């Protein structure tokens, strides 16, 4: 149960002077590790994520267990490799044998109040209330999730709490690639002069396995970018970064609620993502492939005994 062990280790390292700290786990969907301004990316501005990272420990070499939402989340909340327990594709049901061993259940059994808001995707989009150890405090929607979490944080808790805030964005880049409307408000069409440049590894890799090109060709609804021009890809990257900024603003509301309720002294905050996005590298959108942009994920914890980053 490697993820659970890692999660426990992160919490204990941040909380050596805190007995039974509160735990807040915030994670996004499809956010690559370079998609933060504090990662040195000049194409976006993420003051709230930067604020968390500056106060904590940033793990530069964090990788997801699987480059797809359902399997990655399965690993997060069970601690098992997805293929080992039948969670290898989106829509795979959680095995009954694991329901009593999930992260929420284990932490609840340790004496915590456990709450979950936002996207679940194992396989239902929302976590069933009172299952997997969690009270469901909000539906699968980025709109209103921060407010629901802020309300939860304002309560007078008799026990330490474990709060999960699971955001959908920047996953809405999938809708952009398919020319569909965004669920949480559209992004303005930019002038091409305002768009980021192409990545250094924009060209397709001639040594890629045939299965990668086959996946691209045979799943047009997932990878509708075969006809994208370089300008289209630049606009894709612009839109992706605006979606990251959108979710950064929402996460800022949760950070403000932590401030208002004076929770920093006895609270550990962990931030991560389930996987990244191709963002045009190798002319790839979405996930699934084992490209660095897709498997290298955000991971950091706050607060930290001192500001630092580690390559672990």
Which residues does each predicted region cover?
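Sec-dependent signal peptide recognition
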Residues: 1-7
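Active-site-proximal N-terminal segment of extracellular/periplasmic enzymes that hydrolyze or transfer
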Residues: 18-57, 66-67, 176
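Loop/turn elements at helix/coil->beta-strand transitions in domains of secreted/extracellular proteins
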Residues: 20-22, 57-60, 110-113, 158-161, ...
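Alpha-helical packing segments of well-folded alpha/beta enzyme cores
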Residues: 27, 48, 103, 145-149, ...
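Catalytic-site neighborhoods of secreted/periplasmic enzymes
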Residues: 74-187
């Amino acid at each position: 149960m490697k993820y659970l062990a890692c999660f426990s280790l992160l919490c204990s390292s941040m909380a050596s002077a805190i007995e039974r700290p509160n735990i807040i786990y915030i994670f996004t969907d499809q956010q690559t590790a370079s998609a933060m301004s504090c990662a040195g990316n000049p194409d976006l501005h993420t003051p709230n994520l930067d604020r968390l990272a500056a106060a904590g420990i940033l793990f530069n070499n964090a990788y997801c267990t699987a480059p797809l939402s359902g399997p990655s989340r399965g690993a997060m909340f069970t601690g098992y490799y997805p293929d080992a327990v039948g969670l290898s594709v989106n829509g795979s049901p959680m095995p009954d044998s694991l329901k009593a061993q999930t992260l929420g259940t284990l932490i609840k059994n340790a004496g915590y109040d456990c709450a979950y808001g936002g996207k679940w995707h194992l396989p239902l989009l929302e976590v069933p209330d009172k299952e997997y150890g969690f009270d469901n405090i909000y539906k699968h929607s980025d709109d209103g999730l921060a407010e629901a979490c802020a309300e939860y944080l304002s309560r007078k808790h008799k026990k330490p709490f474990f709060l999960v805030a699971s955001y959908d964005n920047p996953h809405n880049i999938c809708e952009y690639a398919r020319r569909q409307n965004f669920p949480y408000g559209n992004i303005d069409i930019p002038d091409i002069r305002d768009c980021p440049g192409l990545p250094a590894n924009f060209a397709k890799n001639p040594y890629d396995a045939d299965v990668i090109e086959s996946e691209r060709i045979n799943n047009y609804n997932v990878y509708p970018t075969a006809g994208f021009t370089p300008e289209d890809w630049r606009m894709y990257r612009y839109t992706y970064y605006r979606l990251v900024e959108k979710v950064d603003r929402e996460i800022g509301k949760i950070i403000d609620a932590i401030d208002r309720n004076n929770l920093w002294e006895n609270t550990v905050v962990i931030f991560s993502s389930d996987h990244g996005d191709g963002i045009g590298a190798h002319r790839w959108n979405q996930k699934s492939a084992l490209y660095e942009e897709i498997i290298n994920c955000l991971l950091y914890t706050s607060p930290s005994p001192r500001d630092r980053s580690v390559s672990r």
